[in-house]
Amino acid sequence: MEKFAPVAALLLLLLCFPVAFSGHDYGQALSKSLLFFEAQRSGVLPRNQRVTWRSHSGLTDGKSSGVNLVGGYYDAGDNVKFGLPMAFTVTMMAWSVIEYGNQLQANGELGNSIDAIKWGTDYFIKAHPEPNVLYGEVGDGNTDHYCWQRPEEMTTDRKAYRIDPSNPGSDLAGETAAAMAAASIVFRRSNPVYSRLLLTHAYQLFDFADKYRGKYDSSITVAQKYYRSVSGYNDELLWAAAWLYQASNNQFYLDYLGRNGDAMGGTGWSMTEFGWDVKYAGVQTLVAKFLMQGKAGRHAPVFRKYQEKADSFMCSLLGKSSRNIQKTPGGLIFRQRWNNMQFVTSASFLTTVYSDYLTSSRSNLRCAAGNVAPSQLLSFAKSQVDYILGDNPRATSYMVGYGNNFPQRVHHRGSSIVSVKVDRTFVTCRGGYATWFSRKGSDPNLLTGAIVGGPDAYDNFADRRDNYEQTEPATYNNAPLLGVLARLSSGHSGYSQFLPVVPAPVVRRPMPIRRPKVTTPVRASGPVAIVQKITSSWVSKGRTYYRYSTTVINKSSRPLKSLNLSIKNLYGPIWGLSRSGNSFGLPSWMHSLPSGKSLEFVYIHSTTPANVAVSSYTLA
């Protein structure tokens, strides 16, 4: 018996401590991963910018289109601002804060996480100047990729591309609505005014996406080569509805998920991926959460089908399904050669939250091979993160700056060229390729926290700057990892939401919402007529809000060259007009209103309609 004493002592020692996720410093990895977002910032950098080799950039974005589009994030190693992956990035960062805010706070990174989210949502507010207009890209991938320049001095085309009713993009508008709705939950306590503003934009964007349907890359065709919408837009409409329900507790969005789950593929597709294009697995995970929380009501049969598909996705990751996801010999899930790591981090996030959802509801995962304990999902997520951080056949960390063996030649313009703060010598478009891209040496600027594309199907990796499939990072690689790292850093301390779940809706036939009377439905001033109507209403925190659509009609036989409106008793945001002091006029993009045509603008507030009157006008 004595020879087993050391083993017994070791076991006793282990039992004295909670089983922690040892081996890697997840808190350090979390802190580094947030720095990457600061390296990707576009616009005027704040004074507390911690990535000091970066400087201001993209300061005229949107100017040629008459809109301010300064800010936001560069998506990867280039200098283009792509709206669809940027919105997904913000949605996933917000989801991380919603579920793991306590853990982020314990690591001292909650504030930095919220700042990273706001950097994105501030930009989306600018990119959504009217209810049915959304700017979805700044810059052109073709011309941008022709050059290798620092973002601070790029000479490439900065044209802005938008979607509108004539050129729709339901996937882009839907994902942006999801991002705004999720972020509104994050700011609900710390900045309630900003939270309400984000939710207002989310409502508008969802309406736009749902009413004017179409794929965004059919309207913004320059995006097709880089971020083609292969899955279409039905997944984004369901995704946006799920986030709007979580943010507003509005029964309409729960009903939308229930009514459209079958027709839009939410209950039909068993997924093997989740990312910026395909959102079904994320939708299924969220709807399963609503079901576990007892919120499904009459939609429970449909929501159970959503959950079956969520279970199927999780089981395929664990190798316990009839259709399992491919893994490398070293155990990393593998989807494709180009930037495979995006699917690793996003799947790891879903398994992490699903493990906690199941644990909270005292449920098990149902797989074809039998029931599986939720802890196995969390262990799977840990295995993927550990692989990223260095537990792999190459002993390589795929997070730049973490560990001793990480990529040194990242496919990234900003990090591969000496900082403009160190050497202000202008780097020309093609000269950047000759001088900096082709260098064999390490990057002059450390892109701390960046998750690169990662190894191939056989765990092989080539640390070369021209190997963009493996060495290029992306914001949507890092975003899902925030929540996973925060959760793993807490060990087995348990699942604890930072923000309370909204109360479950009362399952009964809702009373009709009383709408205020529009006392002056038609108001005319000479040849200009004004018609106001309520198009929607909702309740938030006990207060009813109304969306007013106001139509200005040119009844004359000549074009309306200029118009000044007086709007009194307006207590909320307004879209569709240009503003100068207390006067409102035609939007900047409209030079005149033709005879017989109309202009619509929208405002939202929680009382009777504003008093809209014509102050002056000029006919051509």
Swiss-Prot record:
Active site: D78, H411, D463, E472
This protein's UniProt keywords: Carbohydrate metabolism, Cell wall biogenesis/degradation, Cellulose degradation, Glycoprotein, Glycosidase, Hydrolase, Polysaccharide degradation, Secreted, Signal
Subcellular location: Secreted
Family annotation (Pfam families): CBM49, Glyco_hydro_9
PROSITE patterns: GH9_1 (PS60032), GH9_2 (PS00592), GH9_3 (PS00698)
Main location class: secreted
Enzyme Commission code(s) on record: 3.2.1.4
Glycosylation site positions: N554, N564
Cellular compartments per GO CC: extracellular region
InterPro entries from the UniProt entry: 6-hairpin_glycosidase_sf (IPR008928), 6hp_glycosidase-like_sf (IPR012341), CBM_49 (IPR019028), Glyco_hydro_9 (IPR001701), Glyco_hydro_9_Asp/Glu_AS (IPR033126), Glyco_hydro_9_His_AS (IPR018221)
GO molecular function, a single term: carbohydrate binding
Name of this protein: Endoglucanase 6
